[in-house]
């Protein structure tokens, strides 16, 4: 049985799903009345919390059932976790959640199946005791599944709540050993409200609202309502990273499937991307103009593989000190007898203006500039009435909007970098 983390930011989009939630709420309250679980009526704020919690649980388990029948979601029910103030937590993750789930999973209601988490002391490889915890899991039970089927609920009946935090700030990555493997990960930071985050949030809400109202069609296996974008910043800074993630076209669809799976304004789509974005931003950083042509095409036989040069340059922008070995995944593109230093020398001989840019850890700042350009572009396209789905340094638009969108991409790039942009069409 597959399990994923619960996402209690899901919300109903359609009246049929709202009807199911209303039925569940009604039966929940009838259960409380019958078993005399309450002595008085809830306060308005507590009633609102109850309704939001039931809605979130039913929506997420509906999504789980539709995408992975028989699958489950896991959730923490510890008071320490649920009682902590946390900007990334849903209102459904409150101290009453455990009690609400217990009633929803009761034999009388049978809306969900709940398997409570537990801790067990198990031996490790050296036969030393370690404590392993199994989280509480939830899945749709018979009463909920029946309603999903009777109402013909599909992914299109689901959306996301506006209460979800869309500006995400992560700490610096730290290494840790998990199951015998070295894993590098970054924790979410519970940052204080500030004008910069507020501005980014307002911009992204405007974009998300525009996408929610857009005429987007997909094949049935994709949820065309899933257009919510989040912006992720790195290294504890709102000036590092900033890429946009989310949306069915990024998280649930292969790149090769986009052209035959999406219609925008009832039109086929094209993908427009900024060519050699990272290198152009590096040139902009030093105030220089790049040479004409493909910036990854190096006129030297030892550096003739474009894919390898692209990986090598990207790694050099992110590296915080001189490198002596080929970056991961790039060695295969070069002859076994060719050394890294010979290739990077050939690259920098062709791009002498970038000698002061490599090995300075500037890659995240270039990524931030890329994200700023994309956000500005999406807002400009919205102003022109053009629906665009972002993919890091590219946008998906309808074929009829190709020329206008390409012009907007060039204008935004020039305005923000002082350089001409190369636009590729797929």
For the regions a protein language model found, what residue spans apply to each?
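Short amphipathic alpha-helical interaction segments
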Residues: 88-108, 114
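Short amphipathic alpha-helical interface segments
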Residues: 25-90
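Acidic, glycine-rich two-metal-ion catalytic cores of nucleic acid-processing enzymes
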Residues: 122, 126-308, 392-394
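Short beta-strand-to-loop capping motifs
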Residues: 397-400
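Polymerase palm active-site segment centered on the conserved acidic dipeptide of motif C
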Residues: 402-426
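Helical catalytic core of nucleic-acid polymerases
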Residues: 44-48, 71-94, 245, 249-361, ...
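Active-site palm subdomain of RNA-directed nucleic acid polymerases
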Residues: 372-391
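Intrinsically disordered, low-structural-confidence terminal and linker regions
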Residues: 1-13
């Amino acid at each position: 049985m597959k399990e994923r983390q619960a996402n209690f930011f899901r919300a109903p989009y359609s009246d049929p799903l709202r009807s199911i939630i209303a039925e569940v709420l009604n039966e929940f309250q009838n259960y409380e009345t019958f078993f005399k679980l309450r002595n008085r009526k809830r306060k308005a704020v507590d009633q609102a919390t109850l309704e939001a919690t039931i809605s979130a649980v039913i929506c997420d388990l509906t999504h789980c059932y539709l995408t992975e029948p028989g699958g489950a979601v896991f959730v923490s029910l510890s008071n320490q976790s649920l009682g902590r103030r946390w900007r990334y937590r849903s209102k459904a993750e409150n101290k009453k959640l455990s009690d609400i789930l217990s009633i929803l999973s009761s034999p009388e209601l049978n809306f969900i199946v709940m398997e409570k988490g537990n801790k067990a002391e198990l031996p490790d490889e050296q036969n030393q005791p370690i404590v392993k915890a199994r989280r509480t899991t939830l899945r749709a039970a018979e009463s909920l599944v029946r309603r999903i089927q009777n109402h013909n609920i599909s992914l299109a009946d689901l959306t996301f709540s506006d209460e979800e935090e869309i500006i995400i700030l992560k700490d610096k990555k730290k290494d840790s050993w998990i199951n015998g493997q070295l894993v590098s990960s970054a924790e979410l930071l519970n940052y204080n409200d500030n004008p910069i985050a507020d501005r980014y949030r307002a911009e992204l809400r405007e974009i998300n609202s525009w996408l929610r109202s857009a005429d987007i069609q997909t094949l049935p296996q994709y949820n065309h309502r899933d257009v919510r974008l989040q912006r992720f910043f790195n290294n504890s800074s709102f000036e590092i990273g900033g890429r946009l993630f989310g949306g069915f076209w990024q998280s649930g669809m292969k790149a090769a499937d986009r052209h035959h799976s999406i219609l925008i304004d009832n039109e086929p789509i094209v993908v427009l991307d900024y060519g050699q974005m990272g290198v152009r931003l590096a040139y902009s950083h030093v105030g220089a103009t790049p040479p004409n042509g493909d910036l990854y095409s190096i006129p030297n036989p030892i550096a003739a593989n474009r894919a390898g040069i692209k990986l090598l340059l990207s790694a050099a922008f992110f590296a915080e000190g001189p490198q002596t070995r080929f970056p991961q995944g790039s060695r295969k593109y070069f002859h076994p007898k060719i050394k890294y230093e010979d290739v990077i020398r050939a690259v920098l001989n062709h791009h002498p203006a970038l000698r002061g840019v490599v090995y300075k850890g500037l890659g995240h700042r270039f990524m931030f500039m890329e994200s700023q350009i994309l956000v500005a572009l999406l807002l400009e396209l919205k102003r022109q009435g053009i629906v665009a789905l972002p993919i890091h340094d590219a946008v998906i638009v309808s074929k009829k909007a190709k020329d206008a969108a390409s012009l907007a991409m060039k204008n935004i790039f020039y305005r923000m970098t002082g350089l001409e942009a190369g636009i590729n069409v797929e």
